[in-house]
Regions:
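Short, structured surface patches at the beginning of a domain
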Residues: 1-97
């Protein structure tokens, strides 16, 4: 039987000031990853804004840099940042992997 390796997914959610919305976003992304036949190898949630208060984001980036993640599921890109330069930096780091 020729079995293909399933993509390894990381789920990330962050909606500052809205814990319920963050949890719902995480659940929706998890369901989509499973629907896409991914193995969810990890996930993180941040409850605050600001780069220094986001351990979940830093953990996600370490896993990506370490080659342990093939896909990232995020409900809205604004959960990464509302600033274009931060989004550019995020994608640049992903592409260097």
């Amino acid at each position: 039987m020729d079995e293909q390796k399933r993509p390894r997914a990381w789920v990330y959610a962050r909606i500052p000031g809205d814990y319920d919305g963050t949890i719902n976003s995480y659940k929706v992304c998890s369901m989509q990853a499973l629907h896409d036949s991914c193995d969810i190898v990890g996930g993180s949630i941040d409850e605050r804004g600001g780069w220094l208060l986001r351990p979940g984001y830093r953990d996600m980036m370490q896993q990506i840099k370490g080659g342990k993640v093939d896909r990232v599921y995020i409900c809205r890109m604004r959960q990464i940042s509302g600033k274009e330069r931060h989004l550019y930096s995020f994608f640049k780091r992903l592409m260097q992997r």
